[in-house]
Amino acid sequence: MVIIISGTPASGKSSVSKALAKKFPKSVYIPVDDLRAMVIGGNIAPWDDKFGEQYKLIEKNFLAMTKNFLEEGFVVIIDDVIADEQVKKYQKMFGNVYGFLLLPSIETLKKRDLERDSTGEMHGRIDVLYPEFANSKHDTLKVIDSTNHALSKTVEEIFKQLKNSSH
């Protein structure tokens, strides 16, 4: 099984992914931001127009990792900003893929961003991505409004939906 946790910066993707991974006896967490950070010379920011080519390489790597872990019986949890079309593509590749979009309010996102070890530097990305996610129809990603959720509640909601989907 592959579980994709998507959302804007500060939506809780990493925290939710790590906590969710602990609910499975054999799981792996793939933070795509960490793969992006491996590129030192020639690193292109995700909001740069030229990022698409670099993302293809990053995607190629996290999909290879996904395949390898699946072959060894792991549940794979991927944390990235991923749209419905990508989830559909991954479903065709791996079959058993579930996508979740964490979509707290924009005010909550900005508050969380300031609480992180940052200066609110991702506010601009939040301003761009939030309307895209909030105003799109999602037929593959299941939307979770985690505005007033504790981490454990968001994880339980996802876990419950996964259990219901696998029957």
Regions found by a protein language model. Name each.
Residues 5:
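Hydrophobic anchor at the beta1->P-loop junction of P-loop NTPases
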Residues 8:
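P-loop (Walker A) phosphate-binding loop of NTP-binding proteins
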Residues 11:
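ATP-binding Walker
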Residues 14:
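Walker A/P-loop
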Residues 18-61:
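Conserved substrate/cofactor phosphate-moiety recognition/catalytic segment
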Residues 54-94, 98:
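Glycine-rich phosphate-binding loop used to anchor ATP phosphates in small-molecule kinases
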Residues 94-113:
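Conserved phosphate-donor/acceptor-positioning beta-strand/loop module used by diverse small-molecule
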Residues 115-157:
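Small-molecule kinase domains that catalyze NTP-dependent phosphoryl transfer to phosphate-bearing small molecules
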